[in-house]
Amino acid sequence: MKIKKITCFNFETKNQRYIKYIIIHYTGMNNQRLAIKKLQSKVAKVSAHYLISKRGTVYQMVEDKNIAWHAGKSQWGKDINLNNKSIGIEIVNTGKEAFPKDQIKQLLRLLKILSKKYKIKNKNILGHSDIAPNRKKDPGPLFPWEGIRNLI
C-alpha cells in the first residue's frame, strides 16, 4: 500500500505504546488541502495518524508509535483518553455526503494492515461518536459500518 508522508507538529513523542483501538473520523470539510492545513496547524492543536482523500490517497501525518491528538476527551468501557491507546484515521468528508468507493477501499486496506500489525480486534475499530457521544457525530450516519466490519 502506498502511503504518502506529510509533516504534522501536533503529537506527543513516544518510543513505544500499546495500540488497542482505531478511531475513524470525518474531517467535516470537503476540501482535502484545507483539512491537511488544519491538521498541521499548531493553533488548532489537532492531528491524526492518517488522512484518506476522496480519491483514496492515504497520507500519514503522525507515526503510529506517537500519540496524535484526534480523540479529545473520550472513553470506551474502562479506557479513558483514547489518544494514548489508539490510531486516528481522518476521512475527507463533510459528514453529509456518501463516502466515495475508492476512499472506502483504501480505508479497508489500511484497517487490515493496522489490525494485523497491532492485533486490533474488529470490535475495537470505532467511530469518534462511539468514544465521545455527547460531543462528536463522526464518521456519521452515511458511513458504511456494516460493509467495513464484514470485510476487515
Residue ranges, per PLM feature:
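N-terminal catalytic cores of peptidoglycan-degrading enzymes
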Residues: 1-80
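Short coil-to-beta-strand
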Residues: 80-88
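Basic/polar, cationic surfaces and motifs that engage anionic cell-wall
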Residues: 85, 94-152
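Short loop/turn segments at strand-loop or loop-helix junctions that form parts
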Residues: 90-92
